[in-house]
């Protein structure tokens, strides 16, 4: 990370896409995409996905590391080009507990991530706990972030400290996505970014963490990009001009969250304006979902009814029987909720792919289609971009390859934004 930030600060229009997903096909897509490019790949886990108690994936930080390393080994991707990050590390998961208890768990969370070899650590203590006022005083946020940083510094070995980097601040919706519709988004004011930096610097110095301040590479801000279930707020560079100018005077860059579904030109403009770390998550699993749905349509055309996976029906059955991950986010009317379940840009389906019934039906779908030849006309009908790539001879038409390539469509837009010489 340090090398990428140094090159950006030296004037190169270079950035990095942060892949925020625990889905094995998404991780495989990212690693295959940059297998021969020489670029580093940044893969991040959030505190609610992966923590010392297992998170909703059932993985502790060391488990997630081994999971990613296992995929890298299968793909042949060298570990030294992999950067592992932890996002929203702080009391996020324990906001309903008193601050003292939540911070105790947060310290252990940080230690577990650093001990497992994660080198990019987002120190996020911005959320109010059960006995806190709302919003939290910025100095309290900074003091808590400093305590988390202290935990990281005492855990890291000297070798780890060579690569260890921190991200501070938060200016993002609830981790996991917006719960309600958005119409506009507030761009961070440069004075608020400056205050975030000043309060964190002061709090770090009180704890003797002057050396750690040199490892702070980025501040999370809101440059004016967001999405909800049905709409996207696109980047307007002129609205973020003052914010973009302020960061030039520091040794840092910005990190932008929720950059999913922006145009490739927007990614290039964001990187030009010093939002050099671009996080993406739901757009990747949305592309995965599109690929699964497209393959299900092909299966309906090619496989006899009694042999089909019924993957779309299984998804509906599971999500309606177990609505915990989508109910409070989607519209209450039945017909509207079904559209959201299937097609929402916030992609709450992503929480259901590990479900045993859904996983088995996806496996059957892929097995069924592996046993037949996929007609080019059918691929053109349901995956037209992949059809073009088949015609160019850069893709072979297996179900697995089609899924991977569909996810990589998203990564192509980020590569255009993060790499100045990509046309």
Curated annotation (Swiss-Prot):
Q: Which GO terms describe its cellular component?
A: plasma membrane
UniProt keyword terms in alphabetical order: Galactitol metabolism
Domain of life here?
A: Bacteria
Q: Which residues form the signal peptide?
A: none
- What's its job? Component of the tagatose-1,6-bisphosphate aldolase GatYZ that is required for full activity and stability of the Y subunit. Could have a chaperone-like function for the proper and stable folding of GatY. When expressed alone, GatZ does not show any aldolase activity. Is involved in the catabolism of galactitol.
Family named by the database record: Belongs to the GatZ/KbaZ family. GatZ subfamily.
Q: Which PANTHER family match?
A: D-TAGATOSE-1,6-BISPHOSPHATE ALDOLASE SUBUNIT GATZ, N-ACETYLGALACTOSAMINE PERMEASE II COMPONENT-RELATED
Subunit and partners:
Forms a complex with GatY.
Protein name per its UniProtKB record:
D-tagatose-1,6-bisphosphate aldolase subunit GatZ
- Which gene produces this protein? gatZ
């Amino acid at each position: 990370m340090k090398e990428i930030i140094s090159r950006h600060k030296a004037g190169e229009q270079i950035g990095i896409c942060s892949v925020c997903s625990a889905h094995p096909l998404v991780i495989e897509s990212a690693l295959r995409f940059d297998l021969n490019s020489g670029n580093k790949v940044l893969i991040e886990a959030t505190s609610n996905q992966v923590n010392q108690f297992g998170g909703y994936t059932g993985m502790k930080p060391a488990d997630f590391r081994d999971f990613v390393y296992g995929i890298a080994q299968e793909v042949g991707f060298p570990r030294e080009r992999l950067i592992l990050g932890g996002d929203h590390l702080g009391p996020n998961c324990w906001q309903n507990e008193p601050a003292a208890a939540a911070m105790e768990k947060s310290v252990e969370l940080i230690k577990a991530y650093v001990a497992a070899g994660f080198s990019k650590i987002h120190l996020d203590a911005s959320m109010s706990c059960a006995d806190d006022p709302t919003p939290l005083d910025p100095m309290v946020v900074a003091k808590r972030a400093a305590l988390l940083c202290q935990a990281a510094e005492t855990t890291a070995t000297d070798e780890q400290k060579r690569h260890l980097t921190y991200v501070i601040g938060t200016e993002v919706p609830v981790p996991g996505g917006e719960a309600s519709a958005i119409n506009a988004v507030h761009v961070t004011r440069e004075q608020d970014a400056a205050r975030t930096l000043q309060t964190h610097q002061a709090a770090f110095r009180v704890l003797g963490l002057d050396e750690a301040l040199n490892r702070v590479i980025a501040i999370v801000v809101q440059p004016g990009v967001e999405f909800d279930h049905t709409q996207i707020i696109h980047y307007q560079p002129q609205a973020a001009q003052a914010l973009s100018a302020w960061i030039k005077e520091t040794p840092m860059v910005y990190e932008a969250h929720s950059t999913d579904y922006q145009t490739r030109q927007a990614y290039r403009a964001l990187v030009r304006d010093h939002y050099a770390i671009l996080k993406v998550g739901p757009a990747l699993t949305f592309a995965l979902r599109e690929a699964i749905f497209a393959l299900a349509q092909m299966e309906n055309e090619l496989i006899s009814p009694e042999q089909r996976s019924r993957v779309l029906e299984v998804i509906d059955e599971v999500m309606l029987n177990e609505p915990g991950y989508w109910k409070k986010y989607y519209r209450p009317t039945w017909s509207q909720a079904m559209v959201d379940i299937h097609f929402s840009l916030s992609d709450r389906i992503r929480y259901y792919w590990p479900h045993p019934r859904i996983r088995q039906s996806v496996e059957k779908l892929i097995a069924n289609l592996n046993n037949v030849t996929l007609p080019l006309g059918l691929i053109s009908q349901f995956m037209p971009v992949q059809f073009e790539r088949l015609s160019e001879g850069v893709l072979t038409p297996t179900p697995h390859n089609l899924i991977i390539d569909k996810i990589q469509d998203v990564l192509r837009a980020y590569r255009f934004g993060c790499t100045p010489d990509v046309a």
